[in-house]
Amino acid sequence: MVALLIFLGIFTCVETLPLSDSPSSYIPEEVPSSQTADIGLPPPTEFTLPNEDDEILIRKLNIQKTRKEILYGPSLIGKTSFFISGPLGDQISQRDQTLWSRDAAPVVQAVSHDAAAALHDIQIHGGLQNLDDYKILYQGHWSSSVPGGIAKGQFSNFTSDLLFSMERLSTNPYILRRLHPHADELPFAVDSKIVQKLTGSTLPSLHKAGRLFLADHSYQKDYVAQEGRYAAACQALFYLDDRCHQFLPLAIKTNVGSNLTYTPLDEPNDWLLAKVMFNVNDLFHGQMYHLASTHAVAEIVHLAALRTMSSRHPVLALLQRLMYQAYAIRPIGNNILFNPGGLIDQNSVFSNVAVRKFATDFYPTVAGPVRSNYFEANLRSRGLLNATHGPDLPHFPFYEDGARIIKVIRTFIQSFVKSIYKSDKVLAKDWELQAWIAEANGAAEVIDFPPTPLKKRKHLVDILTHMAWLTGVSHHVLNQGEPVTTSGVLPLHPGSLYAPVPGEKGVVDSLLPWLPNEQKSVDQISFLALFNRPQIVENNRTLRYMFNSESLLAGTVRAVAAANERFMEEMGHISQEISNRKFDDDGLSQGMPFIWTGMDPGVIPFYLSV
């Protein structure tokens, strides 16, 4: 409840921020179509390329003015990308913070009400006396803040090894990689008799066959847990079983204290605690990785565009749509999430200091590069897609859903780009677009951006598709409503351990000492529920309506509007399929013992919502 009180207090402060120093500034409450809306001018009614604009001098003067008023400021929350700055940049950020706060207000109120009811019920029950009691915290509660409820199967199957392993291929697919038979060494040893009994094979044989996978959180051993909280720094080995054709866990190594290695053949409580310890590390990774891989990347690419393209440019208009409220998140996060004593310090095993270190360490090489993080390129680089050194994954929910969604996004972007540029030659002559590419590679310091000059329309399609993927899909797989419904559901996914990592096996009679108590549990659920935005379904701000912007469509040719109609129709079909998922005769959905809907286009926002 302390978290909610702090959130409400900061929310009130942000809500009262002025939109501008000038009372006459035109700053719309809805999604801005272009930067003209930000500087007090009505948005253009038609978008044009610079070499087709009859008012080219005015256009150039506006860009010059914008470059003086939108600047690169210091990074926020670790050393990642520059944050928007300057007189106009500050105004844009304040506007976004105000819009964000208005959206947050009903969520905060709903969470506060839901939390009080959940805490009351568990206290009436007599507290958490066993693991099944954690269901009481959820069942019949959180209907206002999390109306879709908890993912089916998360309670009934929380001890399942298949559930644990398949979460690596759905709720957080960004830490897993296949071990290459030659380029990668085995990360740690596992007793050969245990491996044989579990897999029917040997560790070297699995490695050689490309059937061995690693999720490595050993970097977290450098982080200092907060007082009264504890964490391991787990590495987990997974394997493809050629007998049952499933992706399963093999071993978990803690890398702290006695550095124990756990396997599914250990005592049930020992093994379940090992999975909980891994999930503490994984929940921290997912939440902090999303910050560096989506917010920091999308912002800097867009910021470079703001400084180089006219408000009349159709590409900037599209980017503006995608970046709705984008410049609210890092400053608000800096003030209420990652500040000393803030929400992260209250709910996570590690403090805000670790968050900043994570962002600083991961952004330059893992989370920040653009091209190497294109959807399929990223999966191929980790051996999860089209691997040449091992068999295909029998089920890969993240890819299965993501591939369909990104195909629909790409199809719209292709239509959009072709409607603007009739040929590659036309694109090559667009000096504003080329200035954007040069700026991104230069002053903006975007990592691994397509090189200048941009010569092909397909390369622009790649950039814009990736931006839409980051803002409308990738972000929500790790954040938004996903943690409260799946990846942060108790008792399997606590934000911290509350007892030291065991120094030996066979001493865990109950997991309760390591898990959050009643109050801490309600605090965790409340904290994660604050990220959810259920109201976007009613006001058509879901992924399905990503490009359904009146100003964007009115300012472009009819072909773009037609492409948007097809986009909404296709996303509607995907949404219907995902929302209607059920368990098959084996009690599985997409090969998992829980139903995952984290990419439902009819539920997730089209923008960086939190």
Curated annotation (Swiss-Prot):
<feature type="glycosylation site" description="N-linked (GlcNAc...) asparagine">
    <location>
        <position position="386"/>
    </location>
</feature>
<keyword id="KW-0560">Oxidoreductase</keyword>
<feature type="binding site">
    <location>
        <position position="610"/>
    </location>
    <ligand>
        <name>Mn(2+)</name>
    </ligand>
</feature>
<keyword id="KW-0325">Glycoprotein</keyword>
<dbReference type="GO" id="GO:0046872">
    <property type="term" value="F:metal ion binding"/>
</dbReference>
<keyword id="KW-0223">Dioxygenase</keyword>
<feature type="glycosylation site" description="N-linked (GlcNAc...) asparagine">
    <location>
        <position position="157"/>
    </location>
</feature>
<feature type="glycosylation site" description="N-linked (GlcNAc...) asparagine">
    <location>
        <position position="259"/>
    </location>
</feature>
<keyword id="KW-0964">Secreted</keyword>
<feature type="binding site">
    <location>
        <position position="295"/>
    </location>
    <ligand>
        <name>Mn(2+)</name>
    </ligand>
</feature>
<dbReference type="GO" id="GO:0005576">
    <property type="term" value="C:extracellular region"/>
</dbReference>
<feature type="binding site">
    <location>
        <position position="290"/>
    </location>
    <ligand>
        <name>Mn(2+)</name>
    </ligand>
</feature>
<dbReference type="InterPro" id="IPR000907">
    <property type="entry name" value="LipOase"/>
</dbReference>
<dbReference type="GO" id="GO:0016165">
    <property type="term" value="F:linoleate 13S-lipoxygenase activity"/>
</dbReference>
<feature type="domain" description="Lipoxygenase">
    <location>
        <begin position="47"/>
        <end position="610"/>
    </location>
</feature>
<dbReference type="InterPro" id="IPR036226">
    <property type="entry name" value="LipOase_C_sf"/>
</dbReference>
<protein>
    <recommendedName>
        <fullName>Manganese lipoxygenase</fullName>
        <ecNumber>1.13.11.-</ecNumber>
        <ecNumber>1.13.11.45</ecNumber>
    </recommendedName>
</protein>
<dbReference type="InterPro" id="IPR013819">
    <property type="entry name" value="LipOase_C"/>
</dbReference>
<keyword id="KW-0464">Manganese</keyword>
<feature type="binding site">
    <location>
        <position position="475"/>
    </location>
    <ligand>
        <name>Mn(2+)</name>
    </ligand>
</feature>
<feature type="binding site">
    <location>
        <position position="479"/>
    </location>
    <ligand>
        <name>Mn(2+)</name>
    </ligand>
</feature>
<keyword id="KW-0732">Signal</keyword>
<dbReference type="Pfam" id="PF00305">
    <property type="entry name" value="Lipoxygenase"/>
</dbReference>
<feature type="signal peptide">
    <location>
        <begin position="1"/>
        <end position="16"/>
    </location>
</feature>
<comment type="similarity">
    <text>Belongs to the lipoxygenase family. Manganese lipoxygenase subfamily.</text>
</comment>
<keyword id="KW-0479">Metal-binding</keyword>
<dbReference type="GO" id="GO:0050584">
    <property type="term" value="F:linoleate 11-lipoxygenase activity"/>
</dbReference>
<comment type="function">
    <text>Lipoxygenase that metabolizes linoleic and alpha-linolenic acids to 9-, 11- and 13-hydroperoxy fatty acids. Oxidizes linoleic acid to mainly 11R-, 13S- and racemic 9-HPODE, and alpha-linolenic acid to 11-HPOTrE.</text>
</comment>
<dbReference type="GO" id="GO:0034440">
    <property type="term" value="P:lipid oxidation"/>
</dbReference>
<dbReference type="GO" id="GO:0043651">
    <property type="term" value="P:linoleic acid metabolic process"/>
</dbReference>
<feature type="glycosylation site" description="N-linked (GlcNAc...) asparagine">
    <location>
        <position position="540"/>
    </location>
</feature>
